[in-house]
UniProtKB/Swiss-Prot annotation:
Annotated protein name in UniProt: Bis(5'-nucleosyl)-tetraphosphatase, symmetrical
Hydrolase among keywords: yes
Originating species: Shewanella frigidimarina (strain NCIMB 400)
Reactions performed catalytically: P(1),P(4)-bis(5'-adenosyl) tetraphosphate + H2O = 2 ADP + 2 H(+)
One Pfam family it belongs to: Metallophos
Entry EC no(s): 3.6.1.41
Lineage: Bacteria, Pseudomonadati, Pseudomonadota, Gammaproteobacteria, Alteromonadales
InterPro entries, sorted: ApaH (IPR004617), Calcineurin-like_PHP_ApaH (IPR004843), Metallo-depent_PP-like (IPR029052)
Sorted UniProt keywords: Hydrolase
Enzyme class, first EC level, given as a word: hydrolase
Regions crossing the membrane: none
Length: 272
């Protein structure tokens, strides 16, 4: 079995298929792990979701911020962003089925035999793996309830939940988990999430901010952390235990696949 980890696809389905052809991906024996943001800025979000759903157990997906935003759009809680290309998906006859499939996907996946942890944006450095899995499970539980739109999705859009504390409870605790696992890039020196700066670290000159993966971590280096979300990194973290896979395919760059067993990076340039 080969394990392939792919960066943010964002509806770039054709590029994904070309990438999988390069490695002769075989869903009968291989697994495709996706760091989230399956949908949005590319033009083939519907095909992307249908493909991952069709893979069944051969696909291991975590939710990204754009995937969660799709739930809000489907629930009529938000209006589509002009840069998104989601009309085909939102009007598809199987949209309810696809949304329900997304709701079953977690915020974190682990591959214990290889000491791998995968989330969309990263792992808060103050969380160990037990806290990470517990907090993510609480969000997954809320997503799978009948009232998920009013109880969670409608209330997740805030930047107030920026600081972790074990004393957080209810929606505030869920918000922090969503923000940390799907939106995190830089942290303030006291550990607070920063939601504004999207630059690469080399272009960010504030002494008050550092990339989340430069803080002392309770999950690395004993584990390898796989994430996407931060396209400006272009795959560069300076840490072999922190693997960044978003390389901006939807922005005209390329889609990146990591073959775990060979420790090999394979890329596919954006077609359009």
């Amino acid at each position: 079995m080969a394990h392939y980890f792919v960066g943010d696809i964002q509806g770039c389905y054709s590029e994904l298929q070309l990438l999988l052809q390069k490695v002769a991906f075989n869903p009968s024996k291989d697994q495709l792990w996706a760091v989230g943001d399956l949908v949005a800025r590319g033009t083939e979000s519907l095909a992307t979701l249908r493909f991952f759903q069709s893979l069944q157990d051969s696909a291991k997906v975590v939710l990204g911020n754009h995937d969660l935003h799709l739930l809000a759009l489907h629930g009529k809680l938000k209006r589509p962003h002009p840069q998104d290309h989601l009309d085909e998906l939102l009007n598809a006859p199987d949209i309810d089925n696809l949304v329900n499939w997304l709701r079953q996907q977690p915020l974190v996946r682990t591959l214990p035999e290889h000491n791998i942890i995968m989330t969309h944006a990263g792992v808060p450095p103050q969380w160990d793996i037990a806290i990470l899995e517990h907090e993510a499970e609480q969000v997954s539980f809320a997503l799978q309830q009948d009232d998920y739109l009013s109880a969670l999705i409608a209330q997740m859009y805030t930047e107030d939940a920026e600081h972790w504390s074990p004393s957080l409870h209810g929606i505030d605790r869920l918000r922090y988990c969503i923000n940390a696992l799907t939106r995190m890039r830089f942290l303030h020196l006291d550990g607070r999430l920063d939601f504004k700066c999207k630059l690469p670290p080399s272009e960010q000159h504030s002494t008050e901010l550092r990339p989340w993966f430069e803080f002392a971590s309770k999950t690395a280096p004993q584990n390898t952390l796989i994430f996407g979300h931060w396209a400006a990194l272009m795959g560069q973290t300076g840490n072999p235990h922190v693997v960044a896979l978003d390389t901006g395919c939807c922005w005209g760059e390329h889609l990146t696949l990591w073959h775990l067993e060979k420790n090999e990076i394979i890329t596919q340039k954006r077609l359009i």
